[in-house]
Amino acid sequence: MLCLGIETSCDETAVALFENGRPVLEKLASQADLHAVFGGVVPELASREHLRRLGPLLQALFAASGRSLADVDAIAVARGPGLLGSLLVGLAAAKGLSLATGKPLIGVDHLHAHLLAATIGRDVAFPALGLLVSGGHTQIVRLESALSLEVLGRTLDDAAGEAFDKAAKSFNLPYPGGVYIDVLGRGIAPDKTLFPRPFLDNDHFDFSFSGLKTAVASYAAAHPELRAGSLAEAGGAIDPEAWPMALRRACSSLNFAIAETLRIKFERALDRQPGPPASLIAAGGVAANGPIRAMLADLAARRGLPLYLPEPALCADNAVMIAAAGSRLAEAGYAHDLALTAVPRGRKVPWDYAGGPSGKAASVDSASPAQ
């Protein structure tokens, strides 16, 4: 099966072809430079850029791959959660292509696709316990199979990625700041007491990073030397040696606080599974963070479980994961009609496919049992 994937959920415009379990080709246009001027994603600009770039990217994809739309067996598109205006651009394109060609349309849960990115090209054993960490979501998910999911815990306010982004703003780091915090903290021993490990004094698997955001902002306000305007330009590229040691230690300490918080909750969930999972999975943009990847590798080694992490390029938003998830869904007989709707961030993505085997899989954004 050859599946076309379309990703426009936030600020990456991407299209990809995926065939028989392997990516064929992806074309991606990043908007990072556009939004860097504003210190974050501007939704109106993001949707306009998707509209401008999506058509040429599709043309470039088919030209470079030697394939045509006639070769495609299914059309998959990210339907949410994400920025509503951005999602609508991708959905409009996918619906138009489906209507014109008669090819099946598959709306893909963006979070589900992130988790399945860790399985691309790998024979992952199920059930698996998954950790999804991104700019907008932090979840612990049990995967009975690739298409059967149960959310065990999620963030009650801010996600881990949001904590990284807001901390970067507090320290006046360039956008996207999470990458700077990761790189600047490398090789520096963290001060393990500098920042709190939030929301651990409970007995469930949910997260809250709002308190950590406040702690970092307070620390930055008390140390204005870390927010000097010149810091944003120091070193040009990410050259850790060009940045003040005090800032690097703060970044290392923040990496530790977030990684340790994730570890404690993830290990708590692992201990309370009805049966031991066969695999561990982690995915999402924050899963590219070095200390978090190292923490997960250590946890997996201690538990004697295989750990599956996406390649760094597949941690960020991309169309390969949308096409891969769409392929699995299409092969199982799932599809949508043209009434498919976009689901903005903060809303549950419904499992409203037509066809497929009996029984439903839970949405990846379903409510946590702890709420």
From Swiss-Prot:
Protein name: tRNA N6-adenosine threonylcarbamoyltransferase
Positions bound to Fe cation: 110, 114, 317
Family (UniProt): Belongs to the KAE1 / TsaD family.
SUPFAM superfamilies (alphabetical): Actin-like ATPase domain (SSF53067)
Cellular compartment(s): Cytoplasm
Reactions performed catalytically: L-threonylcarbamoyladenylate + adenosine(37) in tRNA = N(6)-L-threonylcarbamoyladenosine(37) in tRNA + AMP + H(+)
Cross-referenced Pfam families: TsaD (PF00814)
Annotated source species: Solidesulfovibrio magneticus (strain ATCC 700980 / DSM 13731 / RS-1) (Desulfovibrio magneticus)
Name of the gene this protein is made from: tsaD
The keyword Iron belongs to this UniProt entry's keyword annotation: yes
EC code(s) of this entry: 2.3.1.234
One GO term of the biological process aspect: tRNA threonylcarbamoyladenosine modification
Cofactor(s) needed by this chain: Fe(2+)
Main location: cytoplasm
PANTHER family referenced in this protein's UniProt entry, alphabetically: TRNA N6-ADENOSINE THREONYLCARBAMOYLTRANSFERASE (PTHR11735), TRNA N6-ADENOSINE THREONYLCARBAMOYLTRANSFERASE, MITOCHONDRIAL (PTHR11735:SF6)
Gene3D superfamilies associated with the record: 3.30.420.40
NCBIfam families registered for this protein in UniProt: gcp_kae1, T6A_TsaD_YgjD
Keyword Iron among UniProt keywords: yes
Keyword annotations from UniProtKB, A to Z: Acyltransferase, Cytoplasm, Iron, Metal-binding, Transferase, tRNA processing
MF annotations from Gene Ontology: iron ion binding; N(6)-L-threonylcarbamoyladenine synthase activity
Co-factor binding details: Binds 1 Fe(2+) ion per subunit.
Cited function: Required for the formation of a threonylcarbamoyl group on adenosine at position 37 (t(6)A37) in tRNAs that read codons beginning with adenine. Is involved in the transfer of the threonylcarbamoyl moiety of threonylcarbamoyl-AMP (TC-AMP) to the N6 group of A37, together with TsaE and TsaB. TsaD likely plays a direct catalytic role in this reaction.
Binding site residues for substrate: 132-136, 165, 178, 182, 289
Cellular component aspect of the GO annotation: cytoplasm
